[in-house]
From Swiss-Prot:
It is a multi-pass membrane protein. Broad mercury transporter that mediates the transport of both CH(3)Hg(I) and Hg(II) across the membrane. It holds the Pfam family MerE. Keywords: Cell inner membrane, Cell membrane, Membrane, Mercuric resistance, Plasmid, Transmembrane, Transmembrane helix, Transport. It comes from the Bacteria. It is found in: Cell inner membrane. InterPro entries: MerE. The lineage of its organism: Bacteria, Pseudomonadati, Pseudomonadota, Gammaproteobacteria, Enterobacterales. It comes from Shigella flexneri. The chain crosses the membrane at residues 19-39, 47-67. GO terms for cellular component: plasma membrane. GO terms for molecular function: mercury ion transmembrane transporter activity. Its main location: membrane. This is Broad mercury transporter MerE. The gene is merE.
Amino acid sequence: MNAPDKLPPETRQPVSGYLWGALAVLTCPCHLPILAAVLAGTTAGAFLGEHWGVAALALTGLFVLAVTRLLRAFRGGS
């Protein structure tokens, strides 16, 4: 219907901001125990259980990146 390249730039920025916000919520390090419970019994869950510190560090980095991009998207920066 509406291709992303045909949307005006001011419409595209909030959409990307919401996507970065969703990623920030999912990768928040405080959600790591919930993520471990959801992934229990899977290969990702086994990796998470064995490498708790690495997972926390990676999720923290991704969380900081997502929050930074979220703030830039809603402030109108690039």
